[in-house]
Amino acid sequence: VERGKDVRTRKVDLANISRTQNVDPESNYCFGEGGAGAYSDGKLYTRSKKRGSIEGILNLFCQHGASPTILADAHPHIGTDKLPRVIENMRNRIIECGGEVRFETRMEELLVRNCRIEGVRTDKGEILASAVILATGHSAKDVYRWLHSHDIAIEAKGFAVGVRLEHPSELIDRI
């Protein structure tokens, strides 16, 4: 379940933000396939102490179209121009394996019976599932409010903000 749009359609919405200053609350820099990082600079970075298998994750990116150079780079970088295609390839592989992706679908609540998760209720109906993974990013305040109101423990995570500066190549060449 993804409240935003697919990574390609989302690109149109991001261009619209720049052109008209109108922000679609469900398809913007925070919401949509690939999350906040999909249209960042393409750097792969974690501050988490729970790092897991970084090599495994980098291999997964390579299997879906990232350059194998990220396996050896001290600071792996896929690039803004390539990352959306890698994300799209990952989604297509999930679908090939029998998974399903529902875009423009908002989770409204978890279905819990007898202290067990049984699925989710969305704005488009119920989806039953034996397991649910919430990968909300940092801006799904409605989800956090719902979890809090149902006494489900949540933990705050640090927030990082980056800045991207673009300069004409002539200026950079002079420097």
Predicted regions and their residues:
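Residues forming the flavin
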Residues: 1-43, 47-175
